Amino acid sequence: MRSRSNSGVRLDYYQRIVHRLILAHQEPVTGLFPASNVNSHAWIRDNVYCILAVWGLSMAYKKIADQDEDRAKCYELEQSCVKLMRGLLMAMMNQKDKVEKFKMTQSPYDSLHAKYSSKNGLPVVDDNEWGHLQIDAVSLYLLILAQMTASGLQIVFSLDEVSFIQNLVFYIESAYSIPDYGIWERGDKTNHGEPELNASSIGMAKAALEAMNELDLFGARGGPASVIHVLADEAHKCQAVLQSMLPRESNSKELDSGLLCVIGFPAFAVDDAQLIHNTKDAILSRLQGKYGCKRFLRDGYRTPKEDPSRLYYERWELRMFENIECEWPLFYCYLILFHAFQSDKRAVEEYASRLEKIMVRSEDGILLVPESYAVPQDLVGFEYQKPGSQVREVVGRCPFLWGQSLFILGRLLQEGFLAVGELDPLNRRLGAQKKPDVVVQVVIIAEDNEIRDKLAEHDLHVQTIAEVAPIEVQPARVLSHLYTYLGRNRKLGLSGRKSRDVGILSTSKLYSLKDRIFAFTPQFADLSRFYIASDNELMIDILKGEINFLKSAWDLLGRPLVTLVLKRIHLDQDKIPLAMIQTMRKLKSGYINGTRVMLGSLKDFLNTSAITDLSFLGSTEDGYPDRLHPDVQTYLDEHLLRSFSNRSTMNLRGGQLRPRTLRRRMSCKGAIKKTRSINVDSDNLGMEGPSPLTERRLSSIVPPPWLQANKQSHVSVFATTPEEGPTSSPLSLGNDLIRENIYPVDPHHSRSAIDRRSEFVRQQEMPKILIQRHRAETNFADTEVEELIAMLRETENLEEQGDILQYLVDTQGLDFNTAGLGFKNKSEENATPNANNAGMLEEGRVVTVRDLLKGLYEKACQQKLWGLVRHTAGMLGKRVEDLAKAVTDLLVRQKQVTVGMPPNNEHTITAPLPEVELRQLIHDAYGDDESTAMLTQELMVYLAMFIRTEPQLFHEMLRLRVGLIIQVMAKELSRTLNCDGEAASEHLLNLSPFEMKNLLYHILSGKEFAVSSVARGNLSIVSCKSSRVSKKSQIGLGDPEGEDALIATIDDRQGQWLRRRRLDGALNRVPRDFYSRVWTVLEKCQGLAIEGRVLQQSLTQEMTPGELKFALEVETALNQIPQPEYRQLVVEALMVLTLVTEHNMVPSLGGVIYVEHLVHKANQLFLEDQRKVQGDATLCCAKIKDGKEQQQAASGMLLCGGAAYICQHLYDSAPSGSYGTMTYMSRAVALVLDCVPKHGEMECAIS
């Protein structure tokens, strides 16, 4: 017998250890590992980790397999791995119905089980008896399956199993938005069964998606049918959310040692080296101990203070577990592997030494990794006094197979039997290394020869759609539909991918299908999806952002390819817009916004672009893999004909109808404006919302409070005849001039008569009028509706058409058929259709009011009448592109969203919702105000864009109150344009999508801005720096004279601090580390009272300082304050209190502190100082009041208009300085709190 080499002898030693400690427990039938000798439950996660040592040892044997004996051992170890992975696969395939159902519901009760019987692979607990939804476990299985397959093992045997694996990919691809129970199976750390978004689950899912992409599950023997496909955008969504969360684990766990498996082996899910370093350092500094690392702060599992008789904890008892949490040697194993992959030998040796000191030696001398170490019951008091001082004892399983397996892997790496590349054949560890710059390829295609020739005049040479053949160009929705066929399997009852939107990463590739090649245009350029695609300026802005995104996110083979089609609808007065020409020239130059680009034709980029094979569209199940699925063939044939054809627009002017002389002319002017609910006239934003929703539903037109100031005792719904003189509509502020400017109407068409309903209204002797818009209540006769239809045919003015259609919708309904006109109120013998009583026609077909609205919507899009576009889009139920995705993008980055106007109708969105529910929630919040409902959806999309590209804008903001943001935007326009609230609201709703996005950016960033032109729909937002205009919107700049006039007004800085506080309050922005500092204040007092809500000291027992749940509690209390500027003064008062606690001025702050009392005391001190120095406030709040002024003050109205009885001049004071708000807050704290010294000089250095 040949002698063994030293390495062979050493491997035999590890083989014996692996067999004795791990393989001896493997069930012979299923291949699964039971939890222990007395517990037959097999967890997916634990089982996968257990087999890693076996896999690693098999690869070590393969390298030295020079004898049959070694080759046999290698094969036995490999087949043990295959046995386990197939055992888990069979257990999950038995629950294939759950995989299918979960794609639709994403409910925890429809998820795959987290554990199975090790004896037969069947479920062991019911759906509702365990926290089964653990996305990290399924993701870990897929990740290791990919790595093992890449290493040469064949685990998947049939195409049915391939289909199931493909559907497991769909199961985890939305991990970034699905709360689960996480790596420790408990969700919220109180263990009450509340799932939450976990960074460890998202990271593992991201790693699995990237590992499975384009992987052939049959290895070298596979073909196109055995390849797994993943849409790159889904993995990137996980990456973006993961990066925004780290180093936080979840809402209730501010840090978790489980993240070590995400930033290192096996996931390598983070591409940012600095973020990896920061996360590791945070774990080591706060969770590392002598015996390993704590799982997370205040983890009560197996501590002596835990009550083992119940699964959950009371919230107040979490504080008991602080500093006595169990420490887990498992995490030293992770740290050894982490540093081994970093090639840091010194750190590997350090943690290996620490680990060996705490391992348990068995009777035969084998080192065992215990599950955890706990403080003994009798030493808990000493550990509280001096954390880390007491000797701990082993609790739980020993050996802990999960940890033992990773320990053996670490030893194999340390002794050189394995290279790190063998444990990571897919090279995931290289993700954080610097990558070469990406060159983005751009192709512009003309819709027809005429557009091509127009571009050629500008020295821009492109091809037409016909000329790029045989390459076919299709919109993104076609690609989305094709992917619904991926993973379908009739035998298993699997329906494939749920139809979802596809992102820019997916459309930036070419796709091959048999002998055809497809290029897809980006989703944002799809005009059929939503109106913002009709705004050329916004499309250019989005294009630049997407090109910049590709630069940072692209990691596929080949270069990204962006394909755009220039259509007739993009033309402006039959000319190509200058903005488009300028952008194309920038693209041609080779750089745009710092990104390297190449402009060319599709055939030029065939060899350099990424190409994906759509072979899954074959009829594989029917035995014809080379033949397209019949449904796919039909779909593609249809789409080739109609994908880029122009849609006809409804002709509102019935060509067959002869206009007849009307007995009287009616005007529905202002019908759309009556639905508006934006209120900006009150100086105190957030105080006066619209009328309560219930009232507004019963009565669609309710005069707002300011109407009571109107001197007229009678209010008309419609404009009167010229003889009777003008009368304000209910929503008018008496500014008819502005309304006429906004709605220019031909005087010939403005003559109108009072209809019967208006006559009825005029008889009522009431200043407030409730007017019903339900069809059952209408007093209109059909003849009058006929006259409205005739007016609709005659008028060329789209605004007037909109008012008429709004009135028809209110009185007749969207589906009112105009064919019925003229019959009901005529005698039967005269009930014959003729040219005078027929309805609106298009090509001989009678149309409904809905059809007329569609035509109006399309015309408004073409003419860029954005206020009308938004309103008609809302009436037609149009959806903003990616609304649910946009809200999800905000929520998963820990930003809650509220919709509706404060304070009455705000609805908070705290979890991702389906699109239908979201739209219903928004429309419930705004009632009949379709314009603002659509604007809310639009702003949500822009907010999501900003949080993806400029997340720093949202730092220290937990809740985005969209309704309040809309009010502030209108208020800012009112301030800048020096106009009243109604005019500002109209200007806001008439902003183009590009300028709306630009204005929102200025609000978020706090930058000063001005408006360079005031033409409707042509407002241009101009950034201002100091008193000079430094930056403008890239498109649509105003005239120089207007800008000069604006610059002159910017010099006056009065009101800047009030504006800043108002903006910060509306955006719920707070100082850095604000919430954790408030926690320290709450720890030293009995409570903090804010606007009637008390934050109890017990919150510090339930939550840690950095816990997101605590921040949300404070935020909820602050949101009780309706005025944003007053809210910011309360925040400043809280910051002064934090300074008191941080400098340890007093051991305790006493009882409940009424924070608002501090603010009002500061205001009183401010007014006293103002009287002494004869400051500005002596003109209002600081002057001696006469009787009338005292009465006004008693009724809550200050002369200066300050909110919440606080002088406007205090709001407009800088925080610092001797007359700064923080100085007065400090003095107020010293006076109000009993614990602060009252005597002696107070030196305050407030920053």
UniProtKB/Swiss-Prot annotation:
Residues bearing PTM Phosphoserine: 1030, 1033
Molecular function via GO: calmodulin binding
Keywords, sorted A to Z: Calmodulin-binding, Carbohydrate metabolism, Cell membrane, Glycogen metabolism, Lipoprotein, Membrane, Phosphoprotein, Prenylation
Post-translational modification: Although the final Cys may be farnesylated, the terminal tripeptide is probably not removed, and the C-terminus is not methylated.
Membrane-topology annotation of the record: Lipid-anchor
Protein's cellular compartments: Cell membrane
Protein name (record): Probable phosphorylase b kinase regulatory subunit alpha
Species whose genome carries this gene: Drosophila melanogaster
